[in-house]
Amino acid sequence: MNPNFLDFEQPIADLQAKIEGLRLVGNDNSLNISDEIARLQDKSNTLTESIFGNLTSWQIARLARHPRRPYTLDYLEHIFTEFEELHGDRHFSDDAAIVGGTARLDGKPVMVIGHQKGREVREKVRRNFGMPRPEGYRKACRLMEMAERFKMPILTFIDTPGAYPGIDAEERNQSEAIAWNLRVMARLKTPIIATVIGEGGSGGALAIGVCDQLNMLQYSTYSVISPEGCASILWKTADKAADAAEAMGITAERLKSLNIVDKVIQEPLGGAHRDPAKMSESIRADLVQQLDMLGKFDNDALLARRYERLMSYGL
């Protein structure tokens, strides 16, 4: 099985393998087989549209975790310029599961903060698989307060299974770190835009998710618990994860219908990992437009709007 394709994408993977095989044959023998390659590519695109037009909630959850999906640092490279990473919470240590720093978007200074999972084994371990400890959230809080002080908008990228539940994190008061971020973000006198780019897991996501504008990528998820965790509680087995995902309403379109999400950003055919540059350009365009819109509010109006937005949840 091709690791770049999930099991429900295998028919697409088979066609792509045939296309690559024909390209190799053409390169080796100087044969003109472009018509056959074009025919197979059209067939692959049609099949991809069919499969991705009927995804279940569980399939979307798995896409949100795809190992090739762009992470925060990938978007930082494509969307922003002059990124300068800042480290440490000034209390305990640095946390590589959250990256953040100053950058420029369309020439304007912004503060960018996001979860980072890591690709290779060593990096995954160093970044704790994108699960921040308290020092990660305290670092994020420090950067957000700095952004307010220097009148910079805050842009966050959410992609985490959840806050780290280990004993060391609990000893350093994980719940307090998350709660404090919620309190601070609700009162910051600067525009905040949050974008869920992969998994939006529980309080670990909310801790950098209180905002004036919430975006979700088309194949991202946002939930209070993972489908496997929910299934383990309700049915005593993770095998019911697909049923849990459907019942929980974790997808972008579902959350948009509930007015929890403000904007669903469409992904390239096959997901963001198929064309990171195109995905980045879509995000960049939306962020620029949204910052222009939020920039029209003075501080009092911005905070009032944020409060009303938060209080409208569940109504």
Curated annotation (Swiss-Prot):
Q: In which pathway does it act?
A: Lipid metabolism; malonyl-CoA biosynthesis; malonyl-CoA from acetyl-CoA: step 1/1
What does the record give as the reaction this protein catalyses? N(6)-carboxybiotinyl-L-lysyl-[protein] + acetyl-CoA = N(6)-biotinyl-L-lysyl-[protein] + malonyl-CoA
User: Which regions form coiled coils?
Assistant: none
Q: Which residues form the CoA carboxyltransferase C-terminal domain?
A: 32-293
Gene3D superfamilies attached to this UniProt entry: 2-enoyl-CoA Hydratase, Chain A, domain 1
> A Gene Ontology biological process annotation?
malonyl-CoA biosynthetic process
Cellular component, GO annotation: acetyl-CoA carboxylase complex
* Quaternary structure (record): Acetyl-CoA carboxylase is a heterohexamer composed of biotin carboxyl carrier protein (AccB), biotin carboxylase (AccC) and two subunits each of ACCase subunit alpha (AccA) and ACCase subunit beta (AccD).
Protein name, UniProt field: Acetyl-coenzyme A carboxylase carboxyl transferase subunit alpha
Name the species this protein comes from.
Pseudomonas putida (strain ATCC 47054 / DSM 6125 / CFBP 8728 / NCIMB 11950 / KT2440)
Report the EC number(s), separated by commas if there are several.
2.1.3.15
Tree of life domain: Bacteria
Which compartments does it reside in?
A: Cytoplasm
Tell me what gene encodes this. Answer: accA
